[in-house]
Amino acid sequence: MEKIRTAVIGCGKVGHFHAYAYQHCENSQLVACLGRNMEKTEAFAAQYGIRAYTDLEKMVRETGVQAVSICTPHPDHGNIAVRCCELGLHIAVEKPLAASLEDCDAMIAAANEAGVTGTTICQRRFYRPAMRVKKAIDDGKLDKPILGTVNMLGWRDMAYYHSDPWRGTWKGEGGGVLINQAPHQLDLLLWYMGDIAELYGVWDTLNHPELEVDDTAAAIIRFKSGAIGNIVVSNSQNPALFGNVRVHGSNGASVGVQTDGGAMFIAGVSGIAEPPVNDLWTVHGEEDMLERYKAEDRAFFNSIDSIHYFHIRQLEDFLSAIIGKRKPLITFEDGRKTVELITGIYRSCRDDMPVKFPLAPENRGGFDGRLK
């Protein structure tokens, strides 16, 4: 089997997920990692038996790396990705794709110019219940989707925000719950419902007075299809409750996936304690399938390394796309759509009015909450 020479950029908590995944992808040979601090980077490299670098060009020259994962704080994604494209590297970027639409557009343009493959990490698309929802929609089992909802009601204490200096700031993170915890659910909503025509959104910091970013947000969406959407996300429920995405059809049928349970997953801190399952299934003639699907998904979850399995699946798809010269399941353009949705909510709240998509030029600047 052809193997792609891979490397990880960013040697923090999420970088370990990618390094482990690359070492367990059949089509990967992990060769290096890149960080800012050589001592920390060497310690990271020692865990995987790879070479440590602080200079990107030197790493490429000496290792012949072909594909990299970018696992740095969100505002750094754009500049790093553009330089990687210029060096001819294929790129997987941790969610969100970037902290601004400008960075997303620069990344997409650079990848197209260089002819390299890009993906953004949305590993929850590989959940079996999430794929089951998508297939039901594509197979017409809901007739026409007319309503899509996201509820992501989690908890992050201040110890979490203090664990890394970039967390909970506009400069270091580019936002709060919307841009850090909610992108997975927002990606699924867009995957299921399609492009947005217009939205009205609000956000606030309601339960973390030390933060300058959002810990709670909501939005009402009109999709281009004419369907309506609703988003409610928060990091203020203690204990955490759940995250789910649901789609309701014009024939009365409804399907849903619970992506997160009450034991919230924090990368590098906690494991995934509860399996993703279909939490709603009223497809006509299939109403009795819900409990069967739940049982199947729980059994599958208990049979895998749930912390790493879905990163492995997405990175295998990414590398297979490179080898097969095809698009990956999740593209940079998909990642941009999620960032545009998040940006639209921030802009709508700032201006206290609905915003139309695609966002107008004056609405595409990097957002700073102090402008509110």
Q: What is the meaning of each model-derived region?
A:
Residues 183, 208, 232-240:
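Glycine-rich phosphate/pyrophosphate-binding beta-alpha loops
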Residues 124-211, 352:
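Predominantly a Rossmann-like dinucleotide-binding segment in NAD(P)-dependent oxidoreductases
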Residues 246, 251-329, 355, 360-372:
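C-terminal glycine/acidic-rich active-site capping loop/insertion
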